[in-house]
Amino acid sequence: GLGDVYKRQTQDSVNTLLSAAQSGREASEVSPLLWASRRSIRSLERILMPVDNAVRGVRVLSRQALGLTEDRDKVSDAQVELLDELSEIMLAISELYGQGKQHGHDEAIEIPDLVQRLRIVGGRAGLDIIDKDGTLSAYMILGQTRSIVVDMLMVCGLSRESAVAHLVPTSQHPAYPPEVWGRED
């Protein structure tokens, strides 16, 4: 259906960017005329994998949401608010890095704010936002939300370890010391 067409187009676009970045890196290593572009190419390569992961994560989240609604189940209002905030942040990031945009000044101003907003979303994305009668799909959507937060923090320049540390722990033994924002407790 239409969703499959969109999925293929999105994945094709991401794959094209990954391939172009690799070609650009190879060319910049060989050609002295392109040596000055190495830093930009490395930055592009650094963000493309988390972008790819986020796109895939959104597709998985969408399938879970479809299953949830087909079963006539729901997620909590807190989960809806979290997803709404995350989608607004992702839109802002896509507009910031949009095709043909000049980077630099806008990034320096907007990225710190977007990172702070993502940290708050990560800090609120705990098991406690699932309704007491929450379904497996609600938990799966929460898991995907958390994964997308990590991917988007990495797009904004954080390491994976630092990004994961901004998630409210769901384990008694989190792999990375928590640096959680946006929680009252």
Question: Residue ranges of each PLM-predicted region?
Answer:
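Short, small-residue-biased leader/transition segments that mark boundaries at the very start
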Residues: L2-Y6
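A conserved active-site cap/scaffold subdomain adjacent to cofactor or substrate pockets
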Residues: Q11-D12
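Conserved catalytic-core motifs characterized by acidic clusters
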Residues: Q22-S40, T69-R72
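Soluble C-terminal extramembrane regulatory/interaction domains of multi-pass membrane proteins
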Residues: S43-D185
